[in-house]
Amino acid sequence: FSSRRRHTRLLTVTGVQTCALPISGEAYFREIESNVVLDLLETASGVISLGGGSILDQKVCAKIRELKEGNLVVFLDVSLNQASSRIGLNRDRPLLLNNPRAQWMNLMERRRPIYDSLASCTILTDNMKPNEVAEQILERIKHD
């Protein structure tokens, strides 16, 4: 599943949008997100693209570790400069308000060890086109 489809499912299941995060709070959003992600991890086949904060839930991490046996878990890494140009760190992203660059660095500092522990492999996606990233993943699948 792509991030867009996951997000659509989150909207369908809950009626909550990420822009509602400041109103409802991060804890509420993460609870809903975790439930949807766990459901997808249990029932979906194929590619599942998780949001960056999905791994903050211990149940999600445990399920990913369980599924890691026999599956490829890829951490698509990106530098701050590339992230900035891709997502526009100046946009209204609830967790990146008030000095978005520093907030992004703080989030990555906290999350990177989790990403690294869950990933079968890491691909630095800086300056790569989506098809190039896909080719790298396919190469990794062939060699596993």
Annotate each predicted stretch with a short phrase.
Residues 72, 112-144:
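NTP-dependent small-molecule kinase module
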